[in-house]
């Protein structure tokens, strides 16, 4: 009969090598994934920093009736940079999402997949939060520009309601603001100049909001759909922590009780020994 021991040993070694290869490939994949996570987090942090700088530029522009061109150019550069970086983040998050969906479609479930889903959800939420802050910043700036236009119109003697002013802004025609204004003083001319400046800022702002709207809604819907899953994970983690804390507490109590029992046992043994010595001495005295 042919000895197959060596053949079986060779086959086992080959299987072991395959397992090692799969493990190494998986570890390398997760290392690359975490590098990507850090890159995305860095992009989101960069957007957050730019949003704060945008707020400062808004305040500087509103503080001057005729802001200098350099400040306005710097604001446009910041807005452009935010848009480019946001598109990068969205693209990378989409790529991770598709990768996760492919594995779920194959009914694969692993610790690595759960980690990737959690990281993707966390990054998506953080991204939507920073973009929500940017959107709120833009909306606030629009309202402040609108308020300045309304005040300048009042200076020229023209009173408008908020709804009327909104209709004028939506028309996109700057000439509509000059209608009915008598240009007989430098005050009226200066007021109209600021009105045109603020109107121009609002138009740029609305274009920026429009460009980012679809992306923002897409990511917001994604995060909303993930909300229940994240809440469930957080619930499980919290209960796991409570369970561990109770287990540690119970263990400490058990150790404490065990220690007390051990001390009692030792004391009983010592008492028995002493009692034995006393009895032995007494008996010895009687018969001695």
UniProtKB/Swiss-Prot annotation:
Q: Which domain of life is it from?
A: Eukaryota
Q: Where is the composition biased (Basic and acidic residues)?
A: 1-13
This entry's Gene Ontology molecular function terms read: ATP-dependent protein binding; calcium channel inhibitor activity; calcium-dependent protein binding; chloride channel inhibitor activity; identical protein binding; kinase binding; myosin binding; myosin head/neck binding
Q: Where in the cell is it found?
A: Cytoplasmic vesicle, Secretory vesicle, Synaptic vesicle membrane; Cell membrane; Synapse, Synaptosome
The residue ranges of the t-SNARE coiled-coil homology domain are 192-254
Crosslinked residue numbers (Glycyl lysine isopeptide (Lys-Gly) (interchain with G-Cter in SUMO))? 252-253, 256
Mind telling me which Pfam families this protein's record contains?
A: SNARE (PF05739), Syntaxin (PF00804)
Which UniProt key words apply to this protein?
Cell membrane, Coiled coil, Cytoplasmic vesicle, Exocytosis, Isopeptide bond, Membrane, Neurotransmitter transport, Phosphoprotein, Synapse, Synaptosome, Transmembrane, Transmembrane helix, Transport, Ubl conjugation
Question: What is its biological role?
Answer: Plays an essential role in hormone and neurotransmitter calcium-dependent exocytosis and endocytosis. Part of the SNARE (Soluble NSF Attachment Receptor) complex composed of SNAP25, STX1A and VAMP2 which mediates the fusion of synaptic vesicles with the presynaptic plasma membrane. STX1A and SNAP25 are localized on the plasma membrane while VAMP2 resides in synaptic vesicles. The pairing of the three SNAREs from the N-terminal SNARE motifs to the C-terminal anchors leads to the formation of the SNARE complex, which brings membranes into close proximity and results in final fusion.
By what name is this protein known? Syntaxin-1A
**Lineage, uppermost ranks:** Eukaryota, Metazoa, Chordata, Craniata, Vertebrata
């Amino acid at each position: 009969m042919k000895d197959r021991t060596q053949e079986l040993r060779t086959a086992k070694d080959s299987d072991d090598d395959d397992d090692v290869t799969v493990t190494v490939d998986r570890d390398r994949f997760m290392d690359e994934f975490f590098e990507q996570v850090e890159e995305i987090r860095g992009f989101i942090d960069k957007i957050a920093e730019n949003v704060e700088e945008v707020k400062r530029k808004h305040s500087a522009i509103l503080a001057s009736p005729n802001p200098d061109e350099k400040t306005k150019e710097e604001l446009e550069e910041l807005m452009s940079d935010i848009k480019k970086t946001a598109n990068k983040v969205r693209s990378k998050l989409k790529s991770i999402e598709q990768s996760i969906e492919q594995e779920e479609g194959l009914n694969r479930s692993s610790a690595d997949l759960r980690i990737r889903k959690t990281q993707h959800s966390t990054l998506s939420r953080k991204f939507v939060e920073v973009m929500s802050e940017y959107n709120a910043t833009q909306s606030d700036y629009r309202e402040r520009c609108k308020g300045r236009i309304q005040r300048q119109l009042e200076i020229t003697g023209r009173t408008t309601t908020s709804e009327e002013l909104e209709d004028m802004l939506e028309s996109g025609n700057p000439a509509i603001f000059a209608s009915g204004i008598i240009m007989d003083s430098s005050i009226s001319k200066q007021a109209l100049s600021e009105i045109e400046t603020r109107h121009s800022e609002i138009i740029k702002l609305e274009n920026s909001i429009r460009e980012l709207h679809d992306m923002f809604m897409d990511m917001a819907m994604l995060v909303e759909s993930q909300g229940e899953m994240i809440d469930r994970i957080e619930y499980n983690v919290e209960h796991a922590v409570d369970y561990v804390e109770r287990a540690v507490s119970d263990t400490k109590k058990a150790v404490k009780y065990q220690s007390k029992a051990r001390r009692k046992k030792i004391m009983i043994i010592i008492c028995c020994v002493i009692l034995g010595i006393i009895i032995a001495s007494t008996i010895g005295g009687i018969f001695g």
